[in-house]
Design a protein with these regions (language model features):
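Classical Sec-dependent N-terminal signal peptides that target proteins to the secretory pathway
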Residues: 1-21
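Short S/T/G/P-rich N-terminal loop/turn motif that feeds into the first structured element of a domain
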Residues: 17-217, 226-242
């Protein structure tokens, strides 16, 4: 419970400032996310006669083709820290001009994935953009947090874009490696998914020391409570396959 509280306090300060004037709300509604990718999130369960070793072997085989980096920008597996590797999430991300949903499903089946796990292959295509604090090309993700959130009435993406930039600038100045994925099914939707990717094991220590108790963190925390609410938050060990 304590860890959850720490995560929640930190992540609510990444959201934005919003004016109380209706004119500002109207202008903010014109600011839309600049989506870069198509995304699919598939929730899966390992079958009773299978295990994590089988899944690891399968994924090692998967990266050998036929789908490659030319087809997939990123393919990640999220494993909850709270269970014994019985459930996981596939996160498939491709460029905005590609949609390989059916090719991906077919490749999984052809390589024998059906014997290892069962997934809810939701065909709803999501769109996203990624933001980095610093160059992370040489780093591996240590863990991720997935938050499912919803804007409050009269609030939207435009209300907190400026604060996102300010937050990333702070991460850069502190040299803290961090990545966010902002995901929506539709830019006009009130619902969105926020994925935080952390690249150092002592990330929480860095944040709690330099940010949590600062004036800026508390100020943006209060602003977030006016903008949106997060319905749930889960922590995952993250494996980048492609």
């Amino acid at each position: 419970m304590k860890n959850y509280f720490i995560f929640f306090i930190f992540f609510i300060f990444i959201f934005s400032c919003a004016s109380e004037k209706k004119e500002t709300f109207d202008l903010n509604s014109l600011i839309k996310p600049k989506f870069q990718f198509n995304d699919y999130l598939f929730e899966c369960n390992i079958k009773e006669n299978s295990n994590l070793i089988n899944l690891e072997a399968f994924l090692s085989s998967f990266v050998k083709g036929p789908l490659t980096k030319d087809d997939i920008d990123t393919f990640k597996v999220y494993v909850p820290k709270s269970n014994s590797f019985q459930t996981f999430i596939f996160h498939l991300q491709t460029s905005i001009d590609k949609d390989i949903y059916f090719d991906f499903i077919e490749t999984l089946s052809q390589k024998g994935f059906d014997k290892i796990a069962v997934c809810e292959f939701n065909s709803n295509k999501l769109t996203s953009f990624n933001e980095f604090s610093i160059d992370l090309n040489l780093s591996d993700i240590e863990f991720s947090e997935i938050l499912r959130c919803e804007y409050n009435t009269d609030y939207n993406y435009g209300n907190f874009r400026i604060s996102i930039n300010k937050f990333l600038d702070q991460m850069r100045s502190l040299k803290i490696p961090y990545e966010l994925n902002y995901i929506q099914e539709d830019s006009s939707s009130r619902e969105f998914i926020w994925i935080n990717n952390f690249y150092t094991k002592d990330f929480l220590n860095q944040i709690s020391t330099k940010w949590i108790n600062s004036y800026e963190a508390n100020q943006i925390k209060n602003e977030f409570l006016s903008n949106a609410q997060c319905l749930d938050s889960n922590i995952y060990q993250t494996f980048k396959i492609i």
